[in-house]
């Protein structure tokens, strides 16, 4: 049944480039791409969730939402301080069935509260925004299967995505940065990628 969503099977960098809505069998034939799969078209919030799992048990969660920029890319991500209890319950049930002995970080991409991707890795764009000591705790989790990090003062943070040619030297307009900081003073930590 159409519409469906077509996307690359392998998506090593977590970018949705190349994905598209396919509205009919004719549309499918016109846009058939080698290396793509199709899935039910989901609607709702697109959430990226990192979870620290110790022997299959969730010990820590963090959720981020992206602002779409078109072409399967995002303009920026908001790393939320708040929890998403319903999504966490859904993901915890899935992990109990599929990852009951796993210790490490798992990243989920969901749309409308349904899993579209699951990765045995973290979102690599913003672990430094999770707080002091988080990276060391992740290393300990992989090394010994234990999660000991205690989060203090969780804050909303932002990661701005920069797409551009590799090898080009980019400059930042310090005045624009200061104006943006003044506009969003007190909203959280800002981070550029």
Outline where the language-model segments fall:
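Active-site nucleotide/adenylate-binding loops and adjacent lid/helix of ATP-dependent enzymes
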Residues: 1-94
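Short, flexible/disordered intra-domain loops and linkers
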Residues: 15-18, 128-130, 169-175
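Short secondary-structure junctions
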Residues: 33-34, 99-102, 183-187
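Short helix-to-loop capping/linker segments positioned immediately adjacent to catalytic or ligand/cofactor-binding
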Residues: 37-38, 93-101, 145-150
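A short, polar/proline- and glycine-enriched secondary-structure boundary/capping micro-motif
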Residues: 70-76, 124-131
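Conserved metal-phosphate-binding beta-hairpin within the catalytic cores
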Residues: 98-128, 150-169
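Gly/Ser/Thr-rich active-site loops/lids in small-molecule metabolic enzymes
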Residues: 126-144
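Peripheral (often C-terminal) accessory segments that flank ATP-dependent C-N-forming ligase machineries
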Residues: 140-193
């Amino acid at each position: 049944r159409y519409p469906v969503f077509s996307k690359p099977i392998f998506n090593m960098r977590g970018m949705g480039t190349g994905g598209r809505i396919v509205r009919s069998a004719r549309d499918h034939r016109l846009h058939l791409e080698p290396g793509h799969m199709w899935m039910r078209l989901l609607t709702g919030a697109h959430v990226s969730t990192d979870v620290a799992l110790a022997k299959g048990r969730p010990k820590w969660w963090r959720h981020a939402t992206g602002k779409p920029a078109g072409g399967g890319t995002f303009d920026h991500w908001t790393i939320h301080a708040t929890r998403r209890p319903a999504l966490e319950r859904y993901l915890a049930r899935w992990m109990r069935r599929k990852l009951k002995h796993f210790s490490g970080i798992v990243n989920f991409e969901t749309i409308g509260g349904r899993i579209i991707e699951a990765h045995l890795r973290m979102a690599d764009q913003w672990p430094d925004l999770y707080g002091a000591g988080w990276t060391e705790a992740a290393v300990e989790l992989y090394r010994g299967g234990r999660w000991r990090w205690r989060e203090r003062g969780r804050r909303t943070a932002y990661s701005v995505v920069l797409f551009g040619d590799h090898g080009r030297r980019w400059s930042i307009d310090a005045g624009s940065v200061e104006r943006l900081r003044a506009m969003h003073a007190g909203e959280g930590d800002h981070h550029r990628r």
